[in-house]
């Protein structure tokens, strides 16, 4: 009985709040307030603005390295495998590829977006 009373009270309170919000008028509604918010961008500016290709390449590089780091996360659980030499070899190969690709990006100035 107590649970039913709590459930009905919460339902009635939710319905009352929904009815109140639908009946109250929208105050201060103007064009910019009714547009969706896009973090940091002016919603009234033109849509075709130039985009930094260097920043885009750094973002793609970050996504690739983030994916490789996600591949490294299950390595502690992989130590429990029966075929330990194969697991160690494959993990060292993955870490070597990650280090070499980071060195390549660094030498090619792919991580500097200020230039």
Swiss-Prot record:
GO terms for cellular component: mitochondrial inner membrane; respiratory chain complex I. It is a multi-pass membrane protein. The keyword Transmembrane applies. Gene3D superfamilies: NADH:ubiquinone/plastoquinone oxidoreductase, chain 3. InterPro entries: NADH_UbQ/plastoQ_OxRdtase_su3, NDAH_ubi_oxred_su3_sf. Keywords: Electron transport, Membrane, Mitochondrion, Mitochondrion inner membrane, NAD, Respiratory chain, Translocase, Transmembrane, Transmembrane helix, Transport, Ubiquinone. It catalyses: a ubiquinone + NADH + 5 H(+)(in) = a ubiquinol + NAD(+) + 4 H(+)(out). It is found in: Mitochondrion inner membrane. One of its GO terms (molecular function) is NADH dehydrogenase (ubiquinone) activity. Core subunit of the mitochondrial membrane respiratory chain NADH dehydrogenase (Complex I) which catalyzes electron transfer from NADH through the respiratory chain, using ubiquinone as an electron acceptor. Essential for the catalytic activity of complex I. Core subunit of respiratory chain NADH dehydrogenase (Complex I) which is composed of 45 different subunits. Interacts with TMEM186. Interacts with TMEM242. This is NADH-ubiquinone oxidoreductase chain 3. It comes from Pan troglodytes. The gene is MT-ND3.
